[in-house]
A protein has these predicted regions:
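Catalytic-core signal marking the mid-to-C-terminal active-site face
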Residues: 163, 169-204
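Short beta-strand segments
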Residues: 33, 56-59, 83-85, 94-97, ...
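Single conserved hydrophobic/aromatic residue that forms the stacking wall/gate
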Residues: 1-7, 11
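A glycine-rich phosphate/pyrophosphate-binding beta-strand-loop-alpha-helix module
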Residues: 16, 20-60
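Short coil/turn connectors at secondary-structure junctions
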Residues: 24-28, 50-54, 76-79, 87-91, ...
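Secondary-shell segments that build the walls of catalytic and ion/ligand-binding clefts
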Residues: 111-170, 175
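Phosphate/diphosphate-binding glycine-rich loops and adjacent basic-rich segments that engage nucleotide
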Residues: 65-133
């Protein structure tokens, strides 16, 4: 789905088609490219799970996170969301950034004047800091869980960038003028119909 640099939320209107395709085929994927911003992903994975499907979504954006052991940004905060359907109950829904903290939370901490945990990010000189301003203003976030989080962030780059035909996070930096406009990113949304892949008792 081509977003033409619009907000990703608009193009999530394709979700009903994704649900239909997954129920017909067992598995379906929706790829959104050239989106300005995806917003939170849990509402869409929850909506898919409410239709009786397992859902996974991930998105990449502009570089803000250094790989484990590095000091320069390469990955986006690269959030992931997962939802599991439950018959006669609300879905189990999970949503998180693969960074140690979402950049929005760092910005809130900066605005409110409180510190962030050690390990959240580095200064522009690559030094550990608990000052959110030093992270937000030229510094860099770190992945959660060190090399493990770094590996998951790389997975998101491959699924929401290379696989769908969009840019890697680091490639968007050249288009970023920091005014809230470009760059753009991609999103990968997977839907699985468990009734086709398992017996009917998968929800025991």
């Amino acid at each position: 789905c081509e977003a033409s640099r619009g907000l990703g939320d608009v193009y999530k209107r394709q979700i009903p088609e994704l649900v239909k395709a997954a129920k017909e085929n067992g598995v379906a994927v929706l790829a959104i490219i050239n989106s300005h911003h995806m917003a939170a992903m849990w509402p869409e994975t929850e909506k898919i799970a409410e239709e009786g499907l397992v859902a996974f979504a991930c998105t990449s954006y502009k570089p803000a996170v250094a790989p484990a052991g590095a000091i320069k940004p390469l990955f986006g905060t690269n959030p992931i969301s997962f939802a599991w359907p439950r018959k006669n109950n609300t879905p189990v829904v999970y949503d998180m950034a693969t960074a140690s903290m979402a950049m929005g939370e760092v910005q809130v901490a900066k605005r409110e004047g409180h510190k962030v945990p050690l390990g959240t990010g580095l200064t522009k000189d690559g030094k550990d800091t608990t000052d959110p301003a030093e992270i937000a203003d030229g510094g860099v976030l770190l992945p959660f869980g060190g090399y493990k989080g770094s590996g998951i962030a790389m997975m998101v780059e491959l699924l929401a960038g290379a696989l769908v035909g969009d840019n890697f996070s680091y490639e968007t930096a050249a288009k970023d003028n920091n005014d809230g406009g470009p760059p753009s990113g991609g999103e990968f949304i997977l839907a699985i119909f468990p009734d086709k892949l398992s017996d009917k008792d998968w929800d025991k």
